[in-house]
Amino acid sequence: ETGESKETGESKETGESKETGESKETGESKETGESKETGESKETGESKETGESKETGESKETGESKETGESKETGESKETGESKETGESKETGESKETGESKETRIYEETKYNKITSEFRETENVKITEESKDREGNKVSGPYENSENSNVTSESEETKKLAEKEENEGEKLGENVNDGASENSEDPKKLTEQEENGTKESSEETKDDKPEENEKKADNKKKKK
């Protein structure tokens, strides 16, 4: 019915093998659609051995095109050794547009860079020297050394004055303390004085009592 051979499991009509799904006529595999003879894939049209694409004729590994011999990455042509982007030749290092050599251009660039860097440095110096002294006084610029020295000397004078005032203040404070210590009496002394006062008053009261007794005695005598 099927015309299929038992031994090989191969179909007569298609001549296709069951196991491999491979066609006799074309020797092409169903699954991969890859040809035995050329090892070329149907879908991509890409060859196994070279990894080269039919349509573009471009190699995978180098990314280089057959027709132009131009590399993808650098965009540089093999024959002329000329770069697409810059239009600059390898051998001479000369630019198409300007017809100017690299060496001179580089020299100009370095000169320009040098000038700008020097200018920046001097600016920075100015900025740093506009900072403050140790005493916290503002310093205006690098060329005003005389003024700066005056500033420092003034600050020293003010320092000395401040120190003098502090010393005087301390002396005054000491005097005040001395006076206080002289005038102020110790609490022990005060308590002793108070005790003495009470003793004196008690003695007075004792003295008062005999006087009263005497008076009483006089009265009694008078009555008698």
Swiss-Prot record:
Key word Glycoprotein present: no
UniProt KW Chaperone keyword: no
Compositionally skewed regions (Basic and acidic residues) per UniProt: 1-137, 156-173, 185-217
Per-repeat ranges for Sequence: 1-6, 7-12, 13-18, 19-24, 25-30, 31-36, 37-42, 43-48, 49-54, 55-60, 61-66, 67-72, 73-78, 79-84, 85-90, 91-96, 97-102
Top-level taxon in the UniProt lineage: Eukaryota
Stretches for region 17 X 6 AA tandem repeats of E-T-G-E-S-K: 1-102
Annotated segments matching region Disordered: 1-224
Low complexity bias: start-end ranges: 144-153
Keywords, sorted A to Z: Malaria, Repeat
General remark: This variable antigen is associated with the surface of erythrocytes infected with mature stages of plasmodium falciparum.
Protein name: Processed variable antigen
Organism: Plasmodium falciparum
Organism classification: Eukaryota, Sar, Alveolata, Apicomplexa, Aconoidasida
